[in-house]
Amino acid sequence: MAMKLLMLVIFFAIMVSVGIYARKHATSVDGYVLGGRSVGPWLTAFAYGTSYFSAVVFVGYAGQFGWKYGLASTWIGLGNAIIGSLLAWVVLGRRTKVMTQHLNSKTMPDFFGERYESKALKITASAIVFIFLVPYTASVYNGLSRLFGMAFNIPYKYCVIGMAVFTGIYVILGGYMATAINDFIQWIIMLGGIVAVILAVLNGQGGFIQAIKTMAEIPSDVPVTMGQPGAFTSFFGPDPLNLLGVVILTSLGTWGLPQMVGKFYAIKDEKSINTGTVISTLFAIVISGGCYFLGGFGRLFDAPELHDEAGNMIFDGIIPHMLSTLPDILIGIVVVLVLSASMSTLASLVLTSSSTLTLDFLKDNVMKDMSEKKQVRTMQVMVVFFIVLSVVIAMDPPTFIAQLMGISWGALAGAFLAPFMYGLYWKGVTRAAVWASFAAGVGITVLNLFFHFIASPINAGAIAMVAGLIVVPVVSVLTPKLKKDRVDEIFACYDEKVTITKKRSLEQN
């Protein structure tokens, strides 16, 4: 117990120290929100990766999808790496940096307002962020209760409050730079932790080969492959179609999430983009692939305490139960690992929410003529507000809020992905097409919440994203275009000449 507590104390002390160190970078709006747009490849890549994966993934999704799809759930992690990281950096990274800097936009709603010349779009986008990002913020605490109960026998509410307080301290003090530096430290913990845990868990089952053999003997209880042995060790698992929906939602979804795309706003230069692409992809393979691979063995640890009174599986309990027999030192590493994942995601979410509310809604609408210093102070106050709100919701979420948690990822990505990506590449996107994407993304996910015309909320989110990719070009072809001169001026940012060394690019003959 003493070792586990010591690890926690050291971890929190480092987080706060980084916040104090990063204060010098948080004196301006650009510095507080984007780290002065000069963050290097390692910090940006780790900020992207650690914001991607929280306790929701490690404790919730890994247990739930590992139970449902067996070892095939590893495809989710690989999809996160290839689509959610590699392709996201390649397709969005450079153009996001160039165009947002040209437009001087600091948030995704601000981008919509400037790119499509519509204050109404900017305000609506900020409202969508507020409505769906706050419940998602509260969801990062999910899974902590069982894990801390197993490791320390500490009540859930104290875990939530402690995590929120320490996260708030370093975000308020150092803004984006403190978040990025802490993300780097947390990445090291997550990387070492997940490898150690996988090796320890498999060793407890007689090694990798024996664990596979035992898994292969478990008959499928999924309707499409009912009773078949070997389904949970097959290439695509017992239910490939629903597995595909999970891959699309958790991988393609990052392309439209403000807290993820915002990392590209802050990146420093071309070298940072190239290096960051490789680092973030490798990070996702190890962390996300490792989490889902570990969860894929969940059925080997089935026990009565993992079922409720009605006999239903308690998915959040699977991973903690798998880890309960590990030595104290490894349990301590796991606790710090999950805390790292959750705090990095929480920091990114509250920073995104506070900057969006301050810069896209309060500034120039409610609070006129805000000075640079006042904007930073307001964002710091909003960080406190959002963290307190997330704690209140996490303690006892109302039914509707709990439902919003389940659809927030799909609603945000469904609304924003298509108009953001197309807006970076295609001059022909119209204002009406952006409105249509907002309506489709939010409409499909929210209506499905009430009418259940799509059985799985995850599939509903995936369909919302794909719908946006279809709706935007179709509506753009049928509706009036934006002013050509203005659009040409925006896209001229890609034609500006830059000088680079020959080690970065060969000259044309």
For the regions a protein language model found, what residue spans apply to each?
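Membrane-embedded helix-loop-helix hairpins and adjacent transmembrane boundary segments
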Residues: 1-509
